[in-house]
Design a protein with these regions (language model features):
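Short coil/turn connectors at secondary-structure junctions
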Residues: 12, 32-33, 51-53, 79-81, ...
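Short, acidic/small-residue loops that bind anionic groups at enzyme active sites
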Residues: 29-50, 137-163
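Short, well-ordered alpha-helical microsegments
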Residues: 22-26, 43-44, 64-65, 130-133, ...
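Glycine/small-residue-rich loop that forms an oxyanion/phosphate-binding "nest" at active or ligand-binding sites
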Residues: 1-46, 50, 56
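Alpha-helical scaffold segments in soluble metabolic enzymes
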Residues: 6, 27, 46-49, 66-70, ...
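Short, glycine-/small-residue-rich phosphate/pyrophosphate-handling segment
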Residues: 49-86, 102, 165-185
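Active-site rim beta-loop-alpha module in soluble metabolic enzymes
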Residues: 70-134
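Short secondary-structure boundary segments
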Residues: 19, 126-127, 159
Length: 185
């Protein structure tokens, strides 16, 4: 939390939490007076604007329950088609930042399961997974813009969405609009 307060004192305009689980989101928002956004919350909001149902590809089966709980706490339960975990190990996921072939294939397989469950938008539930899918290292010829869809269903770039939500909150704050309610804090 102190690092967030220091960032605010140093003149940063916003804070972006780049872990999909949105750790400490409410605590950071209560602690500073600059916009605090997270890739998880922003992605869920944006996905509901893109389609009626979204599916989430998670990095670990161990986190699926917590992910579903968070989706419901944010009020998006009715939009959730499902959550599936990639079959890649943590090591393979890290290697995807250098060679995304395995990550793309694993994501496509998960995405197809979610599409069968009704997903109209696919959400990678990790900033690092998103980086690998978007940059698509060693896959640039086949995916010049990264993995942007699976069988016609869009893959959300959670990092870009989070960044754009943060930029929007900064712009609105500079225009005089409050960026967060302090009532619940």
């Amino acid at each position: 939390l102190q690092a967030c307060r220091t960032a605010e004192a140093d003149g940063f305009d916003a804070i972006l939490i780049t872990c999909f689980g949105d750790p400490m989101l409410d605590q950071v928002r209560a602690f500073v007076n600059i916009p605090v956004m997270s890739i998880g919350e922003a992605a869920l909001h944006y996905a509901t604007m893109m389609g009626k149902k979204f599916g989430i590809v998670h990095v670990s089966e161990k986190n699926i329950h917590e992910c579903v709980k968070t989706v419901h706490e944010y009020g998006f339960g009715e939009y959730l088609a499902g959550v599936v975990a990639t079959t890649e190990s943590a090591e393979e996921q890290a290697e995807a930042l250098l060679d995304a072939h395995g990550a793309i294939k694993a994501f496509q397989a998960c995405g197809r399961k979610l599409i069968d469950m009704g997903a109209e938008v696919l959400i990678p539930a990790c900033g690092l997974m998103t980086s690998a899918l978007r940059a698509a290292p060693k896959c640039e010829d086949e995916y010049p813009n990264g993995l942007t869809e699976v069988d016609g269903v869009p893959v959300l770039d959670v990092l870009s969405v989070g960044l754009k939500f943060a930029e929007m909150a900064v712009d609105l704050k500079k225009a005089g609009s409050p960026w967060v309610s302090r009532k619940g804090f």
